[in-house]
Regions:
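Short, well-ordered alpha-helix to beta-strand connector turns
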Residues: 94, 227-228
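S-adenosyl-L-methionine
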Residues: 1-113, 117-119, 152-156, 166-171, ...
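Conserved beta-strand signature within the Rossmann-like core of class I S-adenosyl-L-methionine
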Residues: 199-206
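Active-site beta-loop-alpha junctions enriched in small/polar residues
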Residues: 207-209, 236
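Core alpha/beta nucleotide-donor-binding catalytic domains of modification enzymes
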Residues: 104-142
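Short internal loop-to-helix segment that lines adenine-nucleotide cofactor pockets
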Residues: 49-77, 133-135, 142-198, 210-215
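A short acidic, amphipathic alpha-helical/loop segment
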Residues: 89, 93, 187-194, 218-222
C-alpha cells in the first residue's frame, strides 16, 4: 500500500508525463517533418512536442477514413494553411495538396514547409465569395496569424479569389479543409461549382460563438442545402475541460485516466441538428451521395 502511494505522488505523475513527452519526441524524430516554425506561438509549440499541431485528431481522422474503407487519393485542399501543418500531413496521404494562405508571414513559412513534400502547391491568396483585394488584420502578438481575420478597414493588403474561378487540378477533389477564423461561409459561397461536381468531404473548424442559441449554425445549414446531410465530429477526452459544476471527483477521475493513458478519441456521424453547440477542432461534412460509406468509430 505504501509503495502504491509513492507511485501516485505528484513527482511520479510528472515523471510518467515526461516519459510520454519523450516518447512523442522520439516518434517525431523518426517520422515527423522538420518544420520551420514561429517561436512561442500555439501551433508551433504543439508541433515541437507532438510533431504536428492537432496530431491526435489528424491521426484519428485518417484512422476513421480507413475504417470506412475510403481510399485516400486525389486532391486535398487546405484553405487557411497557416505555416503548412495540415498541408504536410495531408501530403502523405493524398496525391496532391493545394494550400492557400493570404498572410504573408505565414505564407513565408508555408512555402518552406511545403518543400518537405513534393506534392504540395502553395498560393499566397485567400478564398472568398468574390475576386477582390482586401485587408488582413493580424494581432500584434500573433504574427503567424492564428487569430487574424479579414477586414475592409485597413490592415495587411491581401488578394481574395473564388475557388470556382481559380481552381485547375487534374485530380478529383476528395477533401477540403477550411480554417479561416469565422470566414468559412464566405469561402464556401465561392466554391459551389467545385462542391457540386466533386462532392468532397469538408473539414472545418467551428467556434462555440458560431452556434446560435437555438443550436443552428450558418455553415452547417449552408452545406446541408448543398446536399451535405451527415456530419462527423470528434470527442477527444484528452482535451475535455471540466467546469466547477462537474465536481472535484470528475476532475480527479479524468486526471487519473490521462496519467494512465486511458482517455479515448471517438468520432460520431450524425444529422445537422444533433451537433453539440461548442468549440469543434473540426467537423466533417459528408455529401448525401457518400453517406452510406460512413459510420461512427
Amino acid at each position: 500500500m505504501f509503495q502504491q502511494r509513492i507511485k501516485n505522488t505528484p513527482i511520479h505523475r510528472q515523471r510518467r508525463r515526461a516519459k510520454r513527452v519523450l516518447s512523442k519526441l522520439q516518434k517525431q524524430k523518426n517520422w515527423y517533418p522538420n518544420f520551420a516554425i514561429i517561436a512561442n506561438e500555439r501551433i508551433s509549440l504543439s508541433i515541437v512536442v507532438e510533431g504536428f499541431f492537432e496530431a491526435e485528431e489528424l491521426d484519428f481522422f485518417i484512422k476513421w477514413i480507413n475504417y470506412q474503407g475510403f481510399e485516400l487519393q486525389g486532391t486535398a485542399i487546405d484553405i487557411g494553411a497557416n505555416i503548412g501543418n495540415h498541408s504536410v500531413f495531408f501530403a502523405r496521404y493524398f496525391e496532391q495538396v493545394l494550400s492557400f494562405e493570404p498572410n504573408p508571414v505565414s505564407y513565408y513559412f508555408l512555402k518552406y514547409n511545403s518543400s518537405l513534400e513534393e506534392n504540395i502547391e502553395t498560393y499566397n491568396v485567400g478564398i472568398s465569395d468574390s475576386n477582390k483585394n482586401s485587408f488582413l488584420k493580424i494581432p500584434d502578438n500573433d504574427i503567424g496569424g492564428c487569430g487574424a481575420y479579414i477586414s475592409n478597414h485597413g490592415g495587411t493588403p491581401i488578394q481574395l479569389v473564388k475557388l470556382d474561378d481559380f481552381l485547375e487540378t487534374k485530380y478529383p477533389i476528395t477533401l477540403i479543409k477550411i480554417d479561416i477564423e469565422g470566414y468559412e461561409l464566405n469561402a464556401l459561397r465561392g466554391m459551389n461549382k467545385v462542391l457540386e461536381f466533386h462532392k468532397p468531404m469538408i473539414l472545418f473548424e467551428q467556434l462555440e460563438n458560431e452556434f446560435q442559441k437555438n443550436g443552428k449554425n450558418n455553415v452547417i445549414e449552408y452545406l446541408s442545402a448543398l446536399g451535405y446531410t451527415k456530419f462527423a465530429y470528434i470527442e477527444n477526452e484528452n482535451t475535455t475541460k471540466y467546469s466547477r459544476k462537474q465536481g472535484y471527483f470528475s476532475k480527479k477521475i479524468h486526471s487519473l485516466k490521462r496519467d494512465l493513458g486511458l482517455l479515448k478519441i471517438k468520432m460520431f456521424v450524425t444529422d445537422k441538428d444533433c451537433i453539440p453547440a461548442r468549440y469543434h477542432t473540426f467537423i466533417i461534412a459528408i455529401h448525401k451521395d457518400n453517406v452510406k460509406k460512413y459510420r461512427d468509430l
